[in-house]
Amino acid sequence: MKITKLEKKKRLYLMELDNGDKCYITEDTIVRFMLSRDKVISEEELKEIQDFAQFSYGKNLALYHLSFKARTEKEVREYLKKYDIDKNIVSQVIANLKEDKWINDGQYAYAIINTNQLSGDKGPYVLTQKLAQKGISKSTIEENLKEFDFSEVAQRVANKLLKKYEGKLPARALQDKIIQNLTNKGFSYSDAKIAFDDLDSQVDQETTQELIFKELDKQYTKYARKYEGYELKQRLTQVLARKGYDFSDIASALREYL
């Protein structure tokens, strides 16, 4: 077979043969096989050219995808699937990129965890979930998590939460709110509790009294329409307890309020 045409088409070249066959190849393919117009190639050589062209095309696509930011193996595989590249060729591309250090799931996991350590707010459980969604193996995630102490991150998040809620919630509700937020962000209950205990949190009696009377004003308007006397007192006690106020503070406030 003889090559009758080699014509550039955007990123690829169109190669035509004298038997009517056509295929798109990359510039790397032309260089590797020293292709030119009128060159004679065999069926076997054509197959090699087509396979390498797909590999070269897939690698170029992957490198373009990786040029914007680091990606995991799973992310690159999914990207290449969109271009209908043969699965075997995709595996070859991935292996080549891993060999050349373009893809390294271990380094990717370390970088994500390290960035979180410096300025993030996630605990190990949420990070594990996020990295697993990226296709990183459980063993790789665990190996990298061992390199970090999350107590500083938990403390940083706890301090921010304290600034947000202090003066707005009674002591017990403040503790519950901060610990719940920390566990939602992926910290264990024990780490969340330690972070809270290390806070300089002081909800004084005056603040508690101010908060409870403010809440009573709101709840009294709601319940006084339906209840009175003992039943009203019970309803107010229940709703204030659910909001984190101690029963002794509730009883004291109700004596003054009612």
Curated annotation (Swiss-Prot):
Gene3D superfamilies found in the cross-reference section: Winged helix-like DNA-binding domain superfamily/Winged helix DNA-binding domain (1.10.10.10)
Subcellular location: Cytoplasm
Record-linked InterPro entries: RecX_HTH_1st, RecX_HTH_2nd, RecX_HTH_3rd, Regulatory_RecX, WH-like_DNA-bd_sf
Predominant subcellular localization, coarse grouping: cytoplasm
Record family assignment: Belongs to the RecX family.
Superkingdom of this protein's organism: Bacteria
Keyword list, A-Z: Cytoplasm
Biological role: Modulates RecA activity.
Protein name (database record): Regulatory protein RecX
Record-level GO cellular component terms: cytoplasm
HAMAP family with a match to the protein in the record: RecX (MF_01114)
Database matches in Pfam families: RecX_HTH1, RecX_HTH2, RecX_HTH3
